[in-house]
Amino acid sequence: MTIWVDADACPNVIKEILYRAAERMQMPLVLVANQSLRVPPSRFIRTLRVAAGFDVADNEIVRQCEAGDLVITADIPLAAEAIEKGAAALNPRGERYTPATIRERLTMRDFMDTLRASGIQTGGPDSLSQRDRQAFAAELEKWWLKVQRSRG
């Protein structure tokens, strides 16, 4: 099992949580980005640099992730594709995507895209709060406990 990170848009504070978790869990952590990233030295942490371009990193994560892996992303279509492959998906605010919730999120995303295309300013998400960081760490821990139980 591997934790895949859509690293170009992932907040640094979330990456720091993931670095510590990868060491503690002894779990491979792969940060996929179209730019160079500085990561702590670790046998569990690596970066995968992809070409710049629309959805290049997302497509690489989808290509390589497998059932049982965890994908960290705020990108709804990427999360949907990861779930289709049997991976778990978690956003940096600690929201676990599920087959039941991903359809709703895709619909809302498409609606917001339509509003923006018509000239309506929709604004962006709030900045990451302490509560978001705690929720992320808690959901990551829940995923890890589930992995441990499945291993016996």
UniProtKB/Swiss-Prot annotation:
Pfam families: DUF188. InterPro entries: UPF0178. PANTHER family: UPF0178 PROTEIN YAII. Belongs to the UPF0178 family. This is UPF0178 protein YaiI.
